[in-house]
Each structure stands twice: as structure tokens, then as C-alpha cells.
Amino acid sequence: MPSKSKAGPDTISSLRSVVPEIFDAAQRSATGHRKHAVALHSLQSKCHSVDVENLTGEMAFTQEFIRNLNKVLGIKKREPSADKIVKLVAIFVQVGHEIDAKAKAQRQKHKQKSGDADDVFADPAADDDEEEGDTVTSRFAESLIKYLLQGFQAKEKMTRVRCCQIVAMSVTNLGAIDEELYFELIRKLTERIRDKEASIRVHAAIALARLQSSDDGEASEVNEALLDLMQNDPSAEVRRAVLLNIEKNASTLPFVLERARDVDATNRKCVFVKVMAAIDYRLLSIEDRERLLVAGINDRDSGVKRACVRMVGESWLTFAGQNLLELTAALDVVDSPAAGKVMQALFAAYTEIPENLSFDNDLWETLTPEVAFVIRATLEFFAERHDSDQLDRHMPDGMRLAQMLEAMGAKLESETDDEVRADHEFVVHQLLLIARMSDFPDELGRRAMLTLMRKMLLVPEIPENNIEAVSDIIRKLSVSEQDFVRIMVEVISDVREPMPTEADGMPAERVRIESLLIGIKCLIIIKYLLQRCFDKLNDGSSIYALLTECIVPAVQSSETVLQEFGIECLALCCLLDRSLAVDNVVLFAQAVRQGAGELHAKGLAALLDLALMYGVADLAPALGAPDMLIKILRNELHSSDERTQATAAEGFARLLYAHRIAEPAPILEELLVLYYHPDTTSNDALRQCLAYFFPAFSYMSNENQVLMQQVAVPTVCRLGGVLKQQAGEGQAGATQSQVAHQVVTWSDPRILDAISVMNGTTTAMSSSGLRVAARMNSYAQLGVDALKKTFSATPNTRKVLVQMLNRLSLDDTTPVTHTQQLFVLVRTLAQQELITDMITRNAMVRFEATLLKLLDVENPDDVNLEAWIEEPEMESVFEFVSSLDEDGPDDEDELEGAESAGDDDDDEEDSVRVASDSDVSERHPSEEPVLAGLNLRSRLPASSAVPSRSPMKRARQERLEELTREIDELL
């Protein structure tokens, strides 16, 4: 309510002192903001009462308030005093509306008691204004918003930021404002969410999100603008602002769930901790829950994983009434691939949950999918923690477990409803997983379980995942590997025994299908048998019988599916016998060359596994040429099928890591090119594998890092054309400069040393001065290779290579010989005038200064080149300098696409070709390159003289003069 204290002209005149005092106090501390806001409102009420009819006092207060606010509009971000004033403005508007609301409630209460008719002194006009929301606070808010909207178009970035920030913080407390102003505000904010400054877009998005309303006609347009911003804005902070403030409803929720795969880890974390934690999981479809959990629990960022688990353990479990079974039912455990991971992560984060669980006899007798899943997950949790006490407390004995499995199997066989059968199959699988964790201490239980497992393998329609679990249980129950093989061979023989024939009265097609199904089942059992065998094959092994009777016929079969399983089983056999692998490598190569689909994929996997097991050198001779195996596998790196490409890349990564390739450099270079090539942008499996491989490989040993140093420059050069073309087409991806920076980082021996120290693997030998010098020797050679390539590279690649030199970070441990070689090459490059842009020239000057510092020389003229020429280590560099010819930049090393990447390079190349040999001899002394400083040619002996090369500037000038003469002749 308005203050009853006396107000007059003195109140207006005191504004210039009182308001600044309040602002000054507010910017010093944020603790008294509400007190300052109340003081401002009291002052505003006094000013309002000065001239109620013309609002003179009220306008004076508003003008003084804005005058003081102006002083913070241009202050930079994260300035505490300015941020406190912004907060004061928002609280002041909020306090005003709260006081107005209380006053309105009191008036209504008074009217209800006395009645409007009895109040003869009531002001009808004032009442109407109050009902329509026309109050001192609302008028002030409208004036403030109108003023701030003018700042939305300011040239100064910080003015736009502060105006949007104040609007964003005040917009929720605006109350009812003029409709025209409301739409104007939305229009202006919609413009600001396209501002080039991310901080402005953040505040504009927050304000726009808080103005969402399902009642106005522009709601859909606002939602569309915000959704587009949340999906496509390059700033993670802007996307996060929309994510946290956009209205959550049926139309926006799918887009909110997409942010669980945002490239920014903080945004992904916000989805789980702040957004979805506040939404009842029952409002989501099963598919949405599944996508959300899969994204969270499989996230590479540990913080996002913890956020996902926290959402389930604190929010979803609360919505489920702390009922774990109800929550498990919501996870759809029967069909969910992520439910197991989620439950294990939940138990690990909240250990009190599994520790307080108990499973009575009634629960075991009435197993549902949810109950069986929780029991299995609990036992698995204790098994992974090696908590034998808890495991023994919950684990049933072997005999009882066998009885439950047998009873559930009987239910499964008698059930006809597909949905119920799926539930029973799931329960059986969970019981098998539980049995796999049991130690079977009692002999009776062990025998009963072994008998039951053999029977289960004979069930015609047993799922493949159950075959795998049964194989594990039989292996655990067997006394040795030979005993396990014997049991499984007997089971396979029993499966094949009732092989159907036409004599049984079945149609030929039915006989073929039944025989095919039996053959597939036998091969699946053989696969899991071989995967659990580790002993080398001997002449008396029962596996040879399986090889002859099942595997070889399957490989030779006309049925593609049998060939696929046969190839896989044959590869597993070859892993147990080297001679068998050598004999069959041609078969696997044929599957890769001529096979399609799964046959091709399994043949490729077989070749890669065998190469990793025995080495390429042992297998290659069987193919007729030492490099034939590498050629076959290398062709798969360029397959049009992304899965094949990723498999080949992963296989080569393993081979390189295990040092199984005799000449690894070309393969490593190929993988680097593949990793950065635009054509593999959509191949997430390939890029994820290589993103882990390159740093792991480089920082594993000094030998690997030397290999990375050898291929760094060729990789950068090869990628120049395609990456430039990609940038020209507006596609997102790495630039050539980023590639150069990354390979230099992977080649840095000091990072390897730091990792060795961190892991505690540093030895006296590895840290010795001799070893450090050897590592820096190969690292400096990377710079030599880069400089040599600049003389024949395209202009764009040349710029990247020169800028790459400053990232080498050479120091006192760099061998002097390499420092001298780098200096000679840098001076020669400067003399050739191949570097034309100022940025690259400055980079070369900086690198030259680094070299002079390492050489302990202040002036380039002080370098004694005559002495260097006599050094044997410098011979190769001077020979290279003397071999430089008249050819222009050579882009043969670049991949396809360089021609269409742009015309700039072509122009420069053409200008180089225009100058003739005679032009070189006409050069005057004054035309020597500015950067040369030191005439290298004059100090070389005649045999090592560097042939002069026509500089670009002179070539362009000659070409320009020639064109001018032609134009004059035409005119």
C-alpha cells in the first residue's frame, strides 16, 4: 500500500541522492537486496503520491532509477557489482508486485466485509485500474521494459548483454503488461536469439522461454524458435539455457530427450539431474525411457553416468514409492539391453539397496521377470564384489536351483501364448545366469544340474543366449577342459542323432529346413565350445571329429547361413592350431574377396584374429606374396560398408598395437587419413575406435611415437585437398591446421615422459640424457620433414606446415645437428619467397628466432655455414637444398578433391609457371627477399650451389605486365 508519510517536492528533489545511495549499497553486498528493494518501493510510493493525477512524481522516480541503471549497462560480464545491481532490479520488480498483490487482497477482503455500496468514498476509477493491473509497479515495469528494448539494438555488445540479462531476470515478475508491448518484447527477443554473441543469446533465450504461454497465438512460433535454438545453436551454454527453461510438454519432451546425446557433457548431465529428475518416469513411453537410460548409462563421461544413476536412484525410485520391483517393471527388463547396467550402477551407488534385500521361499516359488531380474542382479553385484557371505546368504543350493529350472522349463514347453512364453524364457535365462554364479558345493546338486544342462541343450527351440549360459555352466561343472569337450561332443552327437529324412514321411522341403536348423544349432554349440577352449589341439582331440563331421561340411555347403557359421567355427579352430590356420588362410581370404554380408564380415574377422594371434609374417606366405594379406585387409579400409570399414580399422589398430606388422608406417598413415577424412564423418564406430587408439598407441612407447612422427607430415599433406573442399562446402569437421596440431601433440616425447612418470613406469635408462636426446632427435626430424615438404607443397599446405613448426616446442635437449638442419632449411625457404602472407611469414620469423636462441646466436649473419658444410650430418640437408628445381608446387600427395577446393592455389601455381628461366638471371640485388637476410647460396661451395628459383612476386608482376601489354594492343 502507498506510504502514509508526508510527501512533497522535497521527496522529488531527494531522489538524486537517495536512489544512488541505495544502488551503491546494493552493489557492495547481495545480502540486503530485499531490504533495498523495499526501500526503493517505499520511495516510489512517496513519489507517486506527489501528483497522482499527472503521475509527475512517479515519472521522476522512474527516470532517476533508469539514470542510475544506465551506469551498469556497459560494464563487462562477470563484474560482481554490476551483477548485484541487475539482481536488485529483478527483486525490486518482484517486491512491487508482491506488495500490490497483498494490497489487492486486503481491499477484496474489506469489500467482502463492508460491501461496495456502503463505501461512499470509494474511487471507482482507481478500483477499475487496480482490477486491470494498472498499478505503480506495472507502469514502472512497462517503462523499464520499453527502455531496455531500445538497448537490444545497441552497437556495444555489453549493452545488449545487460539489457537482455535484466529482461530475462525481470520477465517472470512483470505481471500483466500491455498486449502490444508483450508482442513487441517477443519480437525483439526472437531477434536477439540470433545475435552473434552467445551470452546475448543465452539471456534472450531465457527471457523468451519464460514468456511461453499456451494461450497466445504466437506460442507455437516461440516454441519452434526455442527448439531450433536447442538443437542447432553452436554454443553449449545457449542450448543449456533453453533446455532448462523451455516448457516441458508432449511436443517439446522428445527434443529435450535428444539433449541426452548433446556433444557437451554438462548439457547431458543437466538432462538427468535437473530436467528429467523432475518429471515422473511414467509420463514417458517405454521407448523414451529406454533411449534415455541407454544414453546415460553408456556415456563415456563418468559424471553423466553418475547423473543418470542419481536420477534413477533418487527421482524415479521416489516416484515408484521406494518399490524396487515397481521401478524394475518400468524398465521393461525383458526387452531392455540397458536394464542390467542400470541396476548394477544403481546398486554400486546405493549399496544399502542390495544389502537390505531379502528373498524368501514364496518369492522363489512365484518368479516373475521382474523378481528374477532383481535376484540375478543382486547376486551378480555381490559376486563382482567377491562378497561371499552375502552371496551364500541369497544363493539357493544346486539341487533346488535345478528343480526350479526344470519346473520353469516345463511351464515354458506347455505355454502357447507368445507373450507369456517370452516371460518364461526370460525367467529361465535369469535362473541360468544365477546357476552360472553358483559353486555347486554339493555333489548331488552338481550331478542334477549337469544332467539338466545336457537335457536343455537337446531342446529344439532353445534360444542362443541360453546355449551360451548352459555352456558356461557345463564348463564350470566339468573337471577339466578335456572333460568339457567330451560332454559337449556327446551333446552335439545327440542333437544330430535324429536327423530327419524323407523316409520319415516328411516333405523334402521340410526335411531340408529341419536339417538346416539342426546343423545351425550344432554349429552354435560348437562355437561356444571352442570359445571356452584354450589348450592346443592334439592328434587325439575330439574337436578334430567335429571339424570333419560338422564344420568342413558347413563351409562347403550351398546354404549361406551354414557357410557363415562354418567359417566362424573354423576360425576358432585355427586359433587353437597354427598349422590349421596356415592351411586355411586362403579360404578366409576368399571369403573376404568374394563373400557378401555376414560371410564377408566373418571372413574378415577371422583374418584379423589370426593375424593378431600368429602375426602377418607367418600367414602371408600361404597367399603367395609377403604383402598379399596386408593388401587384402587394407582394401577393406575403403569399403563402402561402414561396419566393414570399422572392423578393418579396429583390426589394424590391434595389429599395430601388438607390433604384428613388419612395415607399420603406411598402415598408420592410412588410419590417420581415414580418421580425419570427411567420408567417415558418419562412421561413429570407426572414429570412436581410432580416437582411443591414436593416443594410446603413441604414448605406449618411444618406438610408436617415432612411427607417428614419420607419418605426421605425409598425413597432413594428403588431407589438405579434401579438408579444404569440406570447409568450402560448409561441412563441419577438422581443419588441416587442427590435424597438424594433433599429430604434433601425439608425437611429443615430453608427453610420453609425463605419462610414464604419472604411471610410475619411468626407469633410469629411459630418463637418462642419452635416451632423452634420442627421443628429441626423432621429434626434431619431424620439423625437418615438414620444412622439406614446404618446397613442393601447395600454398595452403605450406602455410600449415610452417605454422606447425612453432608447435614443436624445441628446447635445449634438441640435438644441435637437427637445429642446424632446421636453420638451413628455414633460411632457404625464406630466400625462395614461397611464403607470401604475413601471418605465415611471422610464424617463420618466430621459429627462426627459436632456432637462433638454441644455437646461441643473436644475428643470422653470425652463423658459420662454412663449418656446417664440412659436417657429415649436414650433408643430406645441403644435398636437398642443391636439388631444388624449377617446378611449381606439387600437390600429388593430396587426396582427391584438391582441384575443386578453390582457385587460389591454382592461381599461385600458374603464376609460378609463367616466369621463365631467363627472368631469374635478371634479378637485381635490391630484389633479394627481405626475410633472407643471410645469402645462403653465396656461402655454399660451387658443387652445392642452390639453383635460383623464380619468386612468386616477380612471376605475378611479369604476368601482370604481359596482360597489360596485350590489353594495350587490343585497344
State the predicted function of each range.
Residues 893-933, 939, 956-971:
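Low-complexity, intrinsically disordered regulatory regions
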Residues 793-797, 814-818, 935, 940, ...:
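Short amphipathic alpha-helical interaction segments
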Residues 1, 126, 191, 195-197, ...:
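Primarily eukaryotic
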Residues 2-81, 85-88, 284-550, 635-638, ...:
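Long internal repeat-built scaffold domains in very large eukaryotic proteins
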Residues 108-127, 921, 927-930, 934, ...:
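Fungal intrinsically disordered, low-complexity polar regions
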Residues 54-64, 73-264, 270, 274-282, ...:
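Alpha-solenoid helical repeat scaffolds
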